[in-house]
From Swiss-Prot:
Residues given in the record as ATP binding sites: 212, 301, 332, 361-364
Signal peptide region: none
Assembly with partners or alone: Monomer.
Reaction it catalyzes: (2R)-3-phosphoglycerate + ATP = (2R)-3-phospho-glyceroyl phosphate + ADP
Native source organism of the sequence: Leuconostoc citreum (strain KM20)
Lineage, opening ranks: Bacteria, Bacillati, Bacillota, Bacilli, Lactobacillales
BP term (GO), one: gluconeogenesis
Protein name: Phosphoglycerate kinase
Record's keyword annotation contains Kinase: yes
EC class: transferase
InterPro entries assigned: Phosphoglycerate_kinase (IPR001576), Phosphoglycerate_kinase_CS (IPR015911), Phosphoglycerate_kinase_N (IPR015824), Phosphoglycerate_kinase_sf (IPR036043)
Gene Ontology CC annotations of this record: cytosol
Amino acid sequence: MAKLTVSDLELSGKKVLMRVDFNVPIKAGVIGNDNRIVAALPTIKYVLENNGRAILFSHLGRIKSEDDKKELSLAPVAARLGELLGKNVKFVPHTRGEELESAINALQDGEVLMVENTRFEDVVDGVEVKNESKNNPELGKYWAGLGDDLFINDAFGTAHRAHASNVGIASNVSQVAAGFLMEKEIKFLGDAVANPVRPFVAIIGGAKVSDKIEIVKSLLAKADKVIVGGGMAYTFDAAKGEKIGNSLFEADKVELAKELMAEAGDKLVLPVDSIAADAFSNDAKTEVVDATAGIPDGYMGLDIGPKSVKLLQDTLADAKTVVWNGPMGVFEMPNFAKGTLAIGEELVKVTENGGTTIVGGGDSTAAVQQLGVADKLSHISTGGGASLEYLEGKELPGIASISEK
């Protein structure tokens, strides 16, 4: 069944509740990266242009004490949103109460209001109660009552969580629609899982097998090839009996890696060489080491080597759908970023050849942005954990709560 979207709604004159994902990096009131704010603009603008009255909810960081609230107000985010929209965003420094209700009731058509950080509700009078993050039913009902029975969920990044500001509001209104960003995420990730154009190649990187094991299992059942890189690859190398020196690995996951390799056969593509370093430092002494020769003691693998890059390029050469989540090495150090950046470059070629390319996860997204190729790929997912769980085939509460057409 197709989900209800923002373009299916009658918005004029309505108080429209919207969950957005404005969980941006912020330090001393300065926003480090406003990508998530920019990503929500199409939906917000659509509501305003159609004479709706937009009431925005978002979380920011984690609130565990009253002190956290001083650092994590959404006031700077509201100011930045106003600059991007070119109009005043009314900010209310509360999550409930008379001031908030009056401000919402005073809104005119085409105006926008931002509610304070929804996670301020997780700490009340200094006590951690988690009203927002544990989906307190009274809170969801209260927030739902601030609007006109309409709710737009455009926060894919929190779709894997059942919070008061997404699932709680949704369960108390009659029409719940996906915003344009949510709609795009569902389309690209949903098609990749359910109906990929083949060959379908998945690339999974990152430090730990334990973080990504479910996604690797799930993708081995769906994809034609699954490339595994990053720190997690050394657990597979250890499972093959190869020397990994001082490389990161999880001893308790070696048996699991053996089972996966036995089941997957040649579907699973592992690095064949590494850039090994004598210290966890960009200035470390390095050498290229074949996996079969092994990494010597005192050295650790910090990136995939040139033969592995060539193997990845060959594996991706005829791909028609590619999903990438996680770096191939210690991407934040320039000397160990080559493998990760090479994937970004290869994905541009796949896209130019008519393929669909989907990137998720902070490091992978940072890599394509560093290369300046984000706009040359099909889709950059805004959800880290949410995109992984969706690709695993799990039902996400935030998506499940959106109305069917």
